[in-house]
Amino acid sequence: MRPVPALIVGGGPAGAAAAIMLARAGVAAHLIDRHAGPHESVCGGFLGWDALAALRDLGVDALALGARPIGRLRLLSGERCVELALPHAAAGLSRRVLDEALIGRARAVGATVLRGRAVRAADPAGRSIRFDDGEELAGGALFLATGKHELRGLARDLGQRREAPCAGLRAVLPGCPTLAGVIEMHLFDRGYAGLLLQEDGSANLCLSVARERLAGGVAALMAEIMAEAPRLAARMDGKMPAHFEAIAGVPYGWRVAATAPGIFRIGDQGAVIASLAGDGIAIALGSGMSAAQTFAGGGPEAAERWQAQWHRRSRRPIGIAEALRRGAAGPVGRALLMRLLRWMPGLGAQAALLTRVSARRTGERRSGARSAPGPD
């Protein structure tokens, strides 16, 4: 089995960003995507300013793809509502459109893209993978970009976590004019829901909730949430969506501290930020770009150094996001948060800046930025 120089498992934003940067650097990159074509994903409809800048660096114009501009956050808890300006312009775009654009860009700059191929296991010692048909492929370096899904042989070590992972749900709602230019965040007991317009005018609804709240099933959970969040119920016209996409076992706050030689863990395989921070796509893009640049300059031997640096870099933003998530999980914390933001709305913008991992200094990257973020 002759290894390829760089093997990327996962065709989401992290994997595609790594493939683009590697191909640009003249590295023969093989990108493996388990999906045969366009598909939806539970997470990732919000593009922060740092994500938009990273996409421009990669040669992808989100607004040209139809992304809906977002300039304000509307935070809702029960009947209370606070509206805040975001520190920089953001946008809403479906993962179906975003992922296809990134994979197309990777192919255009010279990466080899294999779609519709499911990887069943990995051998970290050999930096190799095994497909579901038994075929094997090895790389000089292996970039693990499987998102929230585990890969046998390289599964994340979550055994020491004190908190059970969360669950994520996604549905599509009819759009409405009151969502123009806004992302809504509806807070409720042990969870929250984000709502924004995407490119086709529909509204993307993403929920994060403590897994134990799903014990009675999705229908029972949604009935409870609609009672707790009346304004969200109004957005849903009092009806439960006909279809939900779901993912379980989301370990918010998790970061990998070390890796095996030649293995780069990027995106959610390296660090998982609470989705209320709105930085997941930016982290995916930034980690993929940074890891690829490190490999291009230092080879497979640089993986362990890069991973340790990314772990350090993500500590504060992810820690702040976790404090916000846990604080908003209960009624006392939610009430305090709403009061603080009503009295001092500037705290919202500061929190948004402090939960950025990919921006060099909490929001420094703007539309003119042209270099991928390093891990330092």
List the model feature ranges, each with a label.
Residues M1-A14:
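Beta1/beta-strand and adjacent pyrophosphate-binding region of the FAD-binding site
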Residues G12-P13, G37-P38, A282:
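Residue-level detector of alpha-helix initiation sites
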Residues L52, R56-I103, P124:
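A conserved beta-strand/loop capping segment in the N-terminal third of enzymes
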Residues R213-T294:
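FAD/FMN-dependent oxidoreductases across multiple families
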